[in-house]
């Protein structure tokens, strides 16, 4: 399970705020503040939460990838392609198929475990790096509540916004990469 606690040692997550989901990725968000029960675009809480967990997982993969890069290794193009695909898949209105999301989550865990084997224990032992994905979708959805945008109530809103802006920029770049790959470039 993902361990995330506030300064008093209490767990925090999107659900603590009374949200089934939280998404403010697009201009369609409810009242311009974010969708919390169902996306205006049709995104369900299940998909939103699986997407949050996918992003959490690729952050973990990146912890190991950074170690390999620092040691002078090149990252396998299949891993880069996978991360690009996850970023593209989590864009608004791209893919709302929970089966695909669970398959991507399982693949993310295989990649992370493979990178762990290569790197051994790393210095950056964040919850992103140490988290192990459970086997069932039900448990994944329980864990996803700790991977959401609003999980850390103590995080400065400007820092949260900056992190999300960077993430959305990466998602946009991945869309171009994905389309170029589809066209054979």
Give the role of each language-model region.
Residues 13-185:
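Metallocofactor- and cofactor-centric catalytic cores in central/energy metabolism, strongly enriched
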Residues 1-12:
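Short, Lys/Arg-enriched N-terminal segments with co-localized hydrophobic residues
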